């Protein structure tokens, strides 16, 4: 299947041209997905990035056909209308024969969860890109994340799950997985044959910096697809385990082959419990907050709602609404 089958470029605002090759080096390209049901979350992430930097940021917003119009409207009818962006339509047919339906966490099987596997196939001329999940708020200057030094031979930089001593107690209390044992089925021979120790630290693929040319050189997308197909046949990990089916291929392919992000650039687990909280001083220090887990900040209950809501922009169409407890009048 060639590029044109996988992606369709839909352009951004009429006055915003696509980034030319000569300008690409001075731009911070951010890739983020926008699903119809969570479009307001994506816009909060974009708003936080845009508001906290003076860098020239270009947003590549990846969506499915049903959300193209909604996404463009959300930008053009709000304060975001000044951002530079391009909307790309993802064709979910590319996932046929690679992803099995599973009812335990259907949200983790959304086609857009797999966009991160196909980054080099986007019609962009950047050598390096940032990928952000839609349940993220950026409090720091995105160009600091973009300028991280990747080690030679590394196609990406992630935050390791063993990097935050201050969160270990909280992580243990809510049963969050931090090792490969929580993501792969070690009873399966295919997993044993990988030679990955079950207690090796996992990493979170919801925020990363990618070297596109290194990714292509190492054929990362092909490797990821191989493990998706393997799981489709053998069920070597299931969405009942931590991270669903989108995280394990990344963990396998990038095992011991990634640069580590500064922990403050990916403070996570905010969505794993409606009770577990970080200290206010630590959250102020954080450059990026991630509500990974089932308790999202646009729903209720969830923690640290104020840090997310300050970047939320109401949906001009009125379709994306926050879930909040009724207050006594």
Name each model feature, range by range.
Residues 1-329:
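Glycosyltransferase catalytic domains, chiefly GT-A lineage
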